[in-house]
Amino acid sequence: MKDKVIEASALDFAYQKQSILHDINLTVYAGEIYGLVGADGAGKSSILQLAVGQLLPANGALKILSKDAADPVLRDDIAYMPQGFGLYPDLSVQENMEFFADLHGLPAQQASIKIRDLLQRTGLTGFESRRGGNLSGGMMQKLALACALVHEPKVMFLDEPTTGVDPLSRRAFWQLIDDVRADGVAILYATANMDEAERCDRVGLLEAGRIIRQGTPAQLVQQQDAYLVMVQGNDIRHYRNEIKQLPGVELAFPIGLRLNVWLQKSCTLESFRQSLQQVAANLSVEMSTASLHDVTLRDLVLTEH
């Protein structure tokens, strides 16, 4: 059994008397990526800021390596990549890394060896003298990750680290993150990107400051009490409202030239097909495999209602 590294229990947070987080419960193990998935304002960043001691909870407990998250002794065991990366634009790539190495008390020789290794792993070798403010988004991301890893943390908190970077940089970033996970580091990863959520070991779906569902991506798909079908035909969007009123239909979302329809399990595919023909004879329906994006969208819409 892997060690528990991050533990949140009945965690609440409020700002200026406004409740932001409600009864957050989650556990992250060594060598695991836990994805906090939700839209802007759902509470992802607040959880990370609580985890690194920038904010204090109103109620509940948040433990990192069995210590209170606000305990300063944790400073050298954790790494935090905030939105915007938190780099120093007037310092060079080398100077940024040296600053963070010094911040965590690495001896000069050890820091030099580690920085050289991370420059190579992140593809920044040859850019040591370039100012942080002159880097592209993808290179800033690589530098931020290198700075976060320079002291070999046991825990990482990443706040939407791939926002605004190109697909190739995102892929390279995830290759590095997979290596970090393999080294046994526990990672709490905030994202609104469903493709990234699929790569996490487990995810927690956040809505309005609450975790409304959590588990592996496969479990979240399997836990649904409805099933997904795809409806196609000419002018499909024209029939959306009528289809939503059919027996057994829970939700209907237009996706391109088709309609994704969630059906209650009590509604058979054949009975829905017959009802559909009453709407328009040219409409066809077939089973569809739900993705994490599909079930997340369903959960969020149902929660809002």
Model-derived features with residue positions:
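Catalytic Walker B motif of ABC-type/P-loop ATPase nucleotide-binding domains
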Residues: 156-160
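Helix-to-loop junction immediately C-terminal to a conserved catalytic motif
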Residues: 52
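Conserved ABC transporter NBD signature motif
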Residues: 60-74
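Conserved ABC ATPase signature
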Residues: 131-135
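Conserved ABC ATPase "signature" region
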Residues: 98, 102, 109-127
